[in-house]
């Protein structure tokens, strides 16, 4: 498919170059739509040359029908029978072709012309063609009678190569009684010209010295060709035109620019000239130019223009003496009274068109500001201070500057104006043993609070300390954190009838004796009831910050059990019932007996009870 596409493209390109222009009236009826380019055609059609139809919209893969054989002849075709394919006809010996010798597959899928025929040759056809020669035959039909002769001669520019060769051809019958041309054996050869020679300081192109070939001449860089650039070997064996020569290139002498000059003595190829300007002028353009191979100076001619500096801007808080801007002019800068001059005092217009220095600054003075709770050292309020000067702020006693104490005057504006504020506390508040300090800032007026660690309590209610003018200050006696002790628990809970209070230690719990008056922070006591009693309230208490917690007083209450209807049969393996079975007999309304058993849980029957273990010597109903 790719091959067919390339074939179609090549055919289209060739068609556009060689296709005849056909008017609408000249186009045969079988022609397809006329076009100029592929865009004029639809679908898979392309704009291609269709013989006598000219450029037409055709299907490049259209196929023509196979050609029938020609009697006493043959047909040669190249490739398949697609559009544009040619069929060439020929006859066997003794026969001559009558009709078109070639036919072409057209866009309408038909072959051009009609089929030719081969008939017995009784006359000679056209005389044979001899390269670079012509004959004097004059038959308009292209057929010659027997014994007809034609003479050959070489065309101009060619000569007879074989001097003894026969230059005549004659129509005779061959052994098969078929008319045939015999002769000539003429050979024509192009006439030769003598060697044209080389060109000095140049190059010759072309090494064939025969008619009708050419030789071309060119010169080396720095030389110009004088004469014709080419010569042709003519039909008479001589070269046309006169020999050319290469002459060294020379540029014309350049003129000096106005207010300047040009330096350089040589004007030959690749010579260089240099331009310069008079004092007070500067060169605009190239400093140097070179003589090119074409005999002209490279680049454009420069010019000299007067050197001028830009007009200086106005000087705020000052003035400029001198208004000239030409080369060498001087401008003097002056500031008004009380202004500070910062920068150059004058500037000169230089050769590069720039001033030697930028304009200065005339800076206004600053007035000494009012400083609350302070002053400016060695200066009085409202006094003028020159721009660029530095002053120092001094704060009153027990005050400090909130930012840098050094002020700089810059063109009537101070770099900053600090505020003298009461001193901050730069040290931590005094440390108190067994306490921690809570505070977020240490500026004047800030407060800090003490909190005693666990097991300690403050010696006073006010636990606050305040920062005043750089010192941490507090009212009353010094803050202390004292150890916390709990008194005998009887003072909190009283006695525990039916039980006892135990003091817990590392090795266990023992009875809290009356002689123990204080217990340290974190110690614990437990409450325990005697047999037949159970505890109501907290089982333990802990000494926290000098108090027993929780403060709820426990009680020991004697145990009672409700009567259970029926009979309880004990499991005699053990007296207690920790998870053991118990059997209950319950009388129902029908005076029948049912036996139930189970662990502490629901016993089903007419009377429902929950039996649970409670003590070593009894059960109770839940």
UniProtKB/Swiss-Prot annotation:
Glycans are attached at residue 411. InterPro entries: Compl-Cell_Adhes-Reg (IPR050350), Elafin-like_sf (IPR036645), Sushi/SCR/CCP_sf (IPR035976), Sushi_SCR_CCP_dom (IPR000436), WAP_dom (IPR008197). GO terms for cellular component: extracellular space; synapse. Residues 1-16 form the signal peptide. Coiled coil: none annotated. It is found in: Synapse; Secreted. Disulfide bonds join 19-49, 35-47, 41-57, 64-105, 91-118, 124-171, 154-188, 193-233, 219-246, 251-291, 277-304, 309-349, 335-362, 366-409, 395-420, 425-467, 452-481, 486-543, 529-556. Keywords: Disulfide bond, Glycoprotein, Repeat, Secreted, Signal, Sushi, Synapse. The record marks 575-576 as: Cleavage. Its main location: other. Residues 576-622 form a propeptide. Proteolytic processing of the C-terminus is required for clustering activity but not for secretion nor traffic. Residues 62-120, 122-190, 191-248, 249-306, 307-364, 365-422, 423-483, 484-558 form the Sushi domain. GO terms for molecular function: peptidase inhibitor activity. Residues 17-61 form the WAP domain. CDD domains: CCP. It comes from the Eukaryota. It holds the Pfam family Sushi. Scaffolding protein that is necessary to cluster acetylcholine receptors at neuromuscular junctions. This is Protein lev-9. It comes from Caenorhabditis elegans.
């Amino acid at each position: 498919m790719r091959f067919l596409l390339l074939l179609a493209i090549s055919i289209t390109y060739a068609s556009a170059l060689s296709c005849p222009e056909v008017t609408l009236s000249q186009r045969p009826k079988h022609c397809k739509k006329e076009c100029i380019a592929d865009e004029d055609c639809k679908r898979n059609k392309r704009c291609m040359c269709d013989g006598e139809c000219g450029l037409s919209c055709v299907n490049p893969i259209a196929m023509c029908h196979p050609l029938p054989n020609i009697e006493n002849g043959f047909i040669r075709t190249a490739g398949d029978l697609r559009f544009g394919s040619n069929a060439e006809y020929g006859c066997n010996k003794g026969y001559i072709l009558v009709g078109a010798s070639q036919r072409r597959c057209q866009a309408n899928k038909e072959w051009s012309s009609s089929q030719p025929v081969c008939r017995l040759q009784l006359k000679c056809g056209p005389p044979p063609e001899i390269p670079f020669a012509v004959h004097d035959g004059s038959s308009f039909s292209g057929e010659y009678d027997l014994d007809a002769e034609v003479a050959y001669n070489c065309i101009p520019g060619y000569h007879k190569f074989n001097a003894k060769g026969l230059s005549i051809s004659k129509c005779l019958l061959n052994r098969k009684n078929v008319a045939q041309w015999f002769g000539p054996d003429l050979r024509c050869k192009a006439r030769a010209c003598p060697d044209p020679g080389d060109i000095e300081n140049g190059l010759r192109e072309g090494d064939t010295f025969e008619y009708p070939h050419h030789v071309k001449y060119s010169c080396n860089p720095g030389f110009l060709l004088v004469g014709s650039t080419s010569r042709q070997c003519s039909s008479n064996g001589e070269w046309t035109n006169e020999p050319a020569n290469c002459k060294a290139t020379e540029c014309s002498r350049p003129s000096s620019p106005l207010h300047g000059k040009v330096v350089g003595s040589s004007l030959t190829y690749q010579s260089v000239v240099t331009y310069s300007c008079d004092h007070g002028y500067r060169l605009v353009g190239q400093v140097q130019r070179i003589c090119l191979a074409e005999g002209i100076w490279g680049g454009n001619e420069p010019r000299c223009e007067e050197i001028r500096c830009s007009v200086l801007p106005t000087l705020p808080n000052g003035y400029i003496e001198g208004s000239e801007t030409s080369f060498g002019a001087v401008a003097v800068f002056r500031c008004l009274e009380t202004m500070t001059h910062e920068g150059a005092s004058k500037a000169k217009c230089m050769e590069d068109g720039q001033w030697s220095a930028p304009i200065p600054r005339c800076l206004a003075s600053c007035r000494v500001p009012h400083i609350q709770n302070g002053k400016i050292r060695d200066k009085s309020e409202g006094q003028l201070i020159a721009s660029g000067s530095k002053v120092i702020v001094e704060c009153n006693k027990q005050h400090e500057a909130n930012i840098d104490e050094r002020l700089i005057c810059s063109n009537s504006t101070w770099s900053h104006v600090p505020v003298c504020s009461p001193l901050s506390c730069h040290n931590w508040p005094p440390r108190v043993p067994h306490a921690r300090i809570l505070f977020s800032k240490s500026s004047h007026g800030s407060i800090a609070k003490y909190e005693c660690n666990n097991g300690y309590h403050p010696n006073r209610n006010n636990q606050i300390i305040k920062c005043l003018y750089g010192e941490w200050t507090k009212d009353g006696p010094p803050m202390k954190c004292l150890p916390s002790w709990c008194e005998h628990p009887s003072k909190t809970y009283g006695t525990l009838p039916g039980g006892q209070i135990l003091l817990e230690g590392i090795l266990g719990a023992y009875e809290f004796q009356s002689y123990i008056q204080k217990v340290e922070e974190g110690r614990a006591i437990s409450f325990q009831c005697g047999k037949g009693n159970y505890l109501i309230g907290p089982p333990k208490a802990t000494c926290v910050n000098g108090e027993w917690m929780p403060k709820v007083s426990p009680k020991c209450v004697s145990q009672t059990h409700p009567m259970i209807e029926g009979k309880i049969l004990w499991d005699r393996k053990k007296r207690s019932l920790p998870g053991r079975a118990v059997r209950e007999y319950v009388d129902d309304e029908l005076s029948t007996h049912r036996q139930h058993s189970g662990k502490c849980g629901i016993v089903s029957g007419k009377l429902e009870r929950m039996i649970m273990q409670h003590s070593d010597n009894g059960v109770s109903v839940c």
